[in-house]
Amino acid sequence: MARFRGSNWKKSRRLGISLSGTGKELEKRPYAPGQHGPNQRKKLSEYALQLREKQKLRYLYGMTERQFRNTFEIAGNQHGVHGENFMQLLAARLDAVVYSLGLARTRRQARQIVNHGHIEVDGKRVDIPSYTLKPGQEISVREKSLKLDIIAESVEINNFVPDYLEFDADNLKGKYIRVPERSELPAEINEQLIVEYYSR
């Protein structure tokens, strides 16, 4: 299944979550798009709730269904709680960490920054957004990309870096210190519904 490339604003309103990370999509119209507007919400079936939760998380990270499902299966082979493992694996993706460090304003922008070869991991260029970081690995902006406006502007407006990451804003370097706790990951996601969806 291809990655969704349509309007993130409409998709955000339909799913009830900000896919850009800015929250602007839901400020004026916190309801699904369409002529019926706020009145078109209806009670969803159990399956529909599970599907919507899966789509929320998949679109949030900008992944294809195959990528998403593969990561879910990897999480299932780890020790611990399946859903929590899954959320932690997603948070350890290189594009997710670039976004969380504040090197990009949105997750989509973070993917582009990685794809275009602006990021190094432990001193080596990595242009794969799905690259999974391990605790202790260092992330930095390549020397030739240090003066990119898109990165400088993002860092300037960012005022929060999660505790599982370390960031040196002056040198545009960060570190993935540890696996995040569930409480440090998106609270608006109910990953158990996703586990139930794939267990059907």
Curated annotation (Swiss-Prot):
GO terms for molecular function: rRNA binding; structural constituent of ribosome. Residues 20-41 are annotated as: Disordered. GO terms for cellular component: small ribosomal subunit. It comes from the Bacteria. Residues 92-155 form the S4 RNA-binding domain. Pfam families: Ribosomal_S4 (PF00163), S4 (PF01479). Part of the 30S ribosomal subunit. Contacts protein S5. The interaction surface between S4 and S5 is involved in control of translational fidelity. Belongs to the universal ribosomal protein uS4 family. This is Small ribosomal subunit protein uS4. It comes from Staphylococcus saprophyticus subsp. saprophyticus (strain ATCC 15305 / DSM 20229 / NCIMB 8711 / NCTC 7292 / S-41). The gene is rpsD.
